Design a protein with these regions (language model features):
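Asp-based, Mg2+/Mn2+-dependent phosphohydrolase catalytic module
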Residues: 1-7, 19-20, 86-87, 110-114, ...
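N-terminal helical cap/lid subdomain that shapes the substrate entry/recognition surface
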Residues: 2-107
């Protein structure tokens, strides 16, 4: 590997665990709807609301990369169905999104970012819709690219190419750090970027492809990258 100039980070499940965050955010949204727009919950459960979003991603493949649009549009449908104004959707989403950005960072996230920020240009690519400024991490990153803004999801190599183009970088001196074998490791490889698999659980490499550079903690990155 040539001397590294820049590091791209995945966000969800790399810098924080995302599953519990989404659960808390959805329950906060349900509590809001119960108080302000109760007819929605007379018609739907959390599971049926999730099912609608999944169906919408199938019905609107051109928008499947935009989790914000899918959630807002499904909420608009719920509003119309329950006889409420569509403005309900934006109100409910605002509640969801506030809690969605109240993440609990992994213990190694800030120490690693502080060390790496002093030596490398740092970027982020995420399929999710987290707000680094709201989370308090924007100071570390030169640029963050979300799938909803890029128009595509990882592992599409074009999302990596778009970030590299904006950063004025070639792929050969860039590494991408993430937890997902397909979205992060295979996506980076397809873009010509060196992947680093963040394997916190110590799992076996699950595919027939050669295993990538691997770390069990973000604090291993400074030594790995030299």
């Amino acid at each position: 590997m040539r001397e590294v100039q820049a590091i791209i980070f995945d966000l969800d499940d790399t810098l924080w665990e995302v599953g519990p965050v989404i659960v808390r955010a959805e329950h906060a949204m349900l509590e809001f709807l119960a108080g302000r727009y109760p007819r929605v919950l007379e018609l739907h459960t959390l599971d049926s609301m999730r099912d609608l979003r999944a169906r919408m991603a199938i019905e609107h493949p051109a928008m499947r990369h935009d989790f914000t649009w899918l959630r807002l549009e499904s909420l608009r449908r719920h509003a119309r169905e329950a006889g409420y104004p569509e403005s309900m959707a934006q109100e409910a989403f605002a509640v969801f999104y506030r809690v969605r950005n109240e993440v609990t960072l992994y213990d190694d996230a800030v120490p690693a970012l502080e060390r790496l920020h002093a030596r490398f240009r740092l970027f982020a690519i995420s399929n999710g819709n987290a707000d680094l400024a709201a989370i308090g991490l924007a100071r570390f990153f030169e640029h963050a690219l979300a799938a909803r803004d890029a128009g595509m999801l990882k592992p599409d190599p074009r999302i990596f190419g778009l970030l590299l183009q904006r950063a004025g970088l070639g792929p050969e001196r860039v590494v991408h750090v993430g937890d997902d074998v397909i979205a992060d490791v295979e996506g980076a490889r397809r873009a010509g970027v060196t992947p680093v698999w963040l394997n916190r659980a110590g799992e076996q490499w699950p595919t027939a492809a050669p295993p990538p550079l691997t770390v069990g903690s973000l604090t291993e990155l400074p030594d790995l990258l030299g």
